[in-house]
Amino acid sequence: MNIVLLIYCLAMVVAHDLQLFGDFKFELSDNWRNDCAKKALEPIINQCAEGIETISPFQQKSIAIQLSICEFENAEISYPSECRSQNLDTCILLLEKSPQYWTTFSGYYREIRNICHQVSLPFAKDQILQVYGNITEFYRTLMDEMTNSSKYTENMQNELKAKFDKLIGVIDLILADREKNREDLKSSFNMFKNNFEKSLNNALVVMKHSYEDANSNVKELESHLNYFINDMSQVYILINEKALEVKSQQDRIKEHNADILNQIEEIKKNLDNAYEEASEVQISNNQLVHDIQSSLDYSLFTVSNLNSHLQLSINDFIEKNEDIRSRAPIIFEEIFGLFLNHLNESGQLAMDSFEAALDLSLNMLHQKLNQTERSIDNLNSKVSDLAHFADSLKKYASSIFNVPNYVRTSMNHKIQQWREFGNIMVVGGVFFFVVLTLLVLSFIRTQVMKVFRFAFIGIPMITGIALAIFILRLLSMPMKVVDID
């Protein structure tokens, strides 16, 4: 702004000086422009300014003739008409015939260089004055334009000031209106916040009760599994005791029947193989129990994943609550609907994951039961083969070696015990397979929540009944001790 004002003041001063300078009149310059000699010397004025040595002899003769003509015309003396046609050679010949003409021509011819030097200074002055006059006119025009621009700028400033005053008034009205709307919006938002917090608290209470119910169901399932594991451990201990008792009786028979050791060596090997098969079956049962435990652990892990999904849903809901607080209350119904959909999707996802995990566990259990059933069938077939082999061997030994009656009685008793043990294993496996099949069919045909209730209550009850029947049958087996003394 300061620079603009400085330029404006400088232009004013220069314009004033030029206006004063334009009042002067240069009469000498006007006379010079109208002089015949000036017109004659115009072709060489520029050369005179650069240097007189640049003037050629032809130019010197032409300028001398033109100056002579000017002098003749000023003195009103007639001269040859050929000199007007710019025929220099003819004109010079005609001027040579008259002493007066020749003296004038020769004088100008000799003084051309001096005249050129004298005339160049007024001509330069005239050029300077002309340029300065043009500059004066330019600055005068510029001054007028700047004056008009200053007036236009002042008018624009006044108009802008009036418009800004009106705009400031409108802005004040808008701000007052917005302040009033802000108070109304604040009260509406507080009301929305209170209602939303109440709804959120109710939803959290419902989710907490659901989580507690699921936790109680998991604990009940854990107690039933512990009961099932304890029963299986007792069965395993009884089987080991029976196996040890059988082995001790075999050792006593071996000690008191040294005479028939070679004949029953093959029977002993077969009994050892049968014992190994029973051990393998026991190991397979233990592996089955371990797989069941793993499946149950996986189910617990799935339940924990369900809990984590619910927790993530709660966290996501809290984040959305923070986002909702910054919005208008008109979107409350849409947000609540989206929240319910999200909870339903999360619950459905968790239920699908739990169903998939339970299906996988049941499939694995079904495979293990099939393997156990095949092992029991193999063991039953081997026990049957062993029984037939023992019967044939007994007959052969009785007919050849006349085996004592107490030995035959002991052998028959042991064979009968192994046969009954194999039958019990087969019946128990078939019963367990039937129960599992019914459970799978009920799981397919009923709703998921009903199956869960049946699984929490029915499976442990059926398993306990089956184990009780198995243990009663095992304990009811006749275990006679043969006195061989």
From Swiss-Prot:
Membrane topology: Multi-pass membrane protein
Keyword hit for Transmembrane helix: yes
Organism: Candida albicans (strain SC5314 / ATCC MYA-2876) (Yeast)
UniProt protein name: Nuclear fusion protein KAR5
PANTHER family attached to this UniProt entry: NUCLEAR FUSION PROTEIN KAR5
Protein function: Required for nuclear membrane fusion during karyogamy.
Places the protein is found: Endoplasmic reticulum membrane; Nucleus membrane
TM helices/strands, residue ranges: 424-444, 451-471
Calcium found in the keyword field: no
Lumenal side of membrane: 16-423, 472-485
Swiss-Prot/TrEMBL keywords: Endoplasmic reticulum, Glycoprotein, Karyogamy, Membrane, Nucleus, Signal, Transmembrane, Transmembrane helix
UniProt xrefs under InterPro entries: Nuclear_fusion_Kar5 (IPR007292)
Cellular component GO terms held in the UniProt record: endoplasmic reticulum membrane; nuclear membrane
Secretion signal span: 1-15
